[in-house]
Swiss-Prot record:
It holds the Pfam family DUF2499. Its main location: plastid. Keywords: Chloroplast, Membrane, Plastid, Transmembrane, Transmembrane helix. It comes from Cyanidium caldarium (Red alga). The lineage of its organism: Eukaryota, Rhodophyta, Bangiophyceae, Cyanidiales, Cyanidiaceae. This is Uncharacterized protein ycf49. The keyword Nucleus does not apply. Belongs to the ycf49 family. PANTHER family: NUCLEOLAR-LIKE PROTEIN-RELATED, YCF49-LIKE PROTEIN.
Amino acid sequence: MYSLSLPTWNIHIVTLVEWSIVIRLIYLFTYFYDIPRSFNFLIIILMIFFFLSGLFACCWHFFNNNSILLWISVAQAALTAFSNFFFLLFISAYYHK
């Protein structure tokens, strides 16, 4: 747990809290402004993948970057790449209309 400084841990934890708040706010925004449910579902699913990626990064650092848990780092990188690709695909399809 000592692989990161306290301010860096603060940034990691605050980012996870921020993602969870934004997921909830997007849900409420699409609910109150009658935005299509498909938009709501897709954007929240993608944001959950980003959130999981950050959670994996925190777990990796919490255990001092242990080489036994290398799969966590690989999963975090895969989730980030997956999320970035599909977020770009989703945004381009949404604005292509």
